[in-house]
């Protein structure tokens, strides 16, 4: 079941955009300055619906700045940025966009169960009670990420990789079909990385747009359809933009860890709702 179908199991979002008619992200002649210096400039970039794109680069290359500019979290010094055809400053259909940062909020700050976290995606200020359709959407989302069996566990009892999967389930339950992840495998073991890759394999098959920022592709190397390599500041900050793998002279850093892991197995079917 596709992400928007999970959402539509309960309700239809008001004021949503027709994402199929527009690119998921569209940056035109973008520039971001930091302390008087351009992090990148004259950068144009389009991410189409259904793409699985990875922004690679070393620390300081501008990859995280680019991601935040696409989301409107970092203002452009010049140029324009759109999300599904709407200027990022006027975009309001945030149920469609899921941003999973590298550092999650402290899971132990509030004792809350996995199911409560995912169901919170369905709450609305003008409704006192959650309907059966909302509960169904939360269940389907947790099954999609293979965590329905942990639904009654506290969030802080889960591993870092499992917590990221809970955040993805939360996004699915609210109706997201565009996923942006910052270093999704940072600090989690190889098995958790593989499970996370399984989740995104299923999302890709459902037609979701996935944009991830990472030092190396690792377990995502089989899934990526496009690689964008950032290599520094200024007008030539993008060294490569195309299908994987990147040229060898650019890939030493971005890809060398990919070969340390065994090839990712075909999807196991565990993610079927």
Model-predicted segments: where are they?
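Catalytic Walker B motif of ABC-type/P-loop ATPase nucleotide-binding domains
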Residues: 179-182
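H-loop/switch region of ABC-family ATPase nucleotide-binding domains
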Residues: 214-215
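Conserved ABC ATPase "signature" region
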Residues: 132-150
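Conserved ABC ATPase signature
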Residues: 154-158
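Helix-to-loop junction immediately C-terminal to a conserved catalytic motif
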Residues: 71
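Conserved ABC transporter NBD signature motif
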Residues: 79-92
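Conserved beta-strand-loop-alpha-helix hinge in the C-terminal portion
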Residues: 233-260
């Amino acid at each position: 079941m596709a992400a928007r179908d999970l959402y539509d199991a309960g309700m239809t979002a008001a004021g949503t955009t027709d994402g199929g008619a527009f690119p998921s992200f569209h940056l035109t002649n973008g520039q971001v300055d930091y302390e008087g210096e351009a992090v990148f400039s004259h950068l144009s970039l389009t991410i189409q619906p259904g793409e699985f794109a990875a922004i690679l680069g070393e620390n300081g290359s501008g990859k995280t700045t680019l991601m935040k500019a696409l989301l409107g979290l970092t203002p452009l010094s010049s140029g324009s940025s759109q999300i599904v055809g709407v200027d990022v400053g006027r975009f309001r259909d945030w149920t469609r966009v899921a941003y999973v940062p590298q550092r999650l909020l402290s899971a132990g700050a509030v004792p809350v169960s996995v199911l409560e976290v995912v169901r919170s995606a369905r709450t609305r200020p003008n409704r006192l009670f959650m309907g059966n359709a909302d509960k169904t959407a939360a269940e389907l989302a947790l099954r999609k990420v293979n965590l329905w069996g942990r639904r009654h566990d506290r969030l802080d009892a889960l591993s870092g990789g499992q917590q990221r999967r809970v955040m993805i389930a939360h996004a699915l339950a609210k109706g997201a079909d565009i996923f942006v992840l910052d270093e999704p495998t940072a600090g989690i073991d190889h098995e958790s990385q593989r499970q996370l890759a399984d989740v995104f394999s299923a999302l890709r098959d459902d037609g979701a747009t996935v944009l991830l920022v990472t030092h190396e592709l690792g377990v995502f190397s089989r899934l990526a359809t496009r690689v964008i390599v950032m290599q520094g500041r200024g007008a030539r900050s993008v060294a490569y933009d195309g299908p994987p793998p990147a040229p060898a002279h650019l890939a030493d850093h971005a890809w060398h860890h990919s070969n340390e892991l065994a090839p990712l197995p075909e999807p196991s079917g565990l993610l079927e709702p």
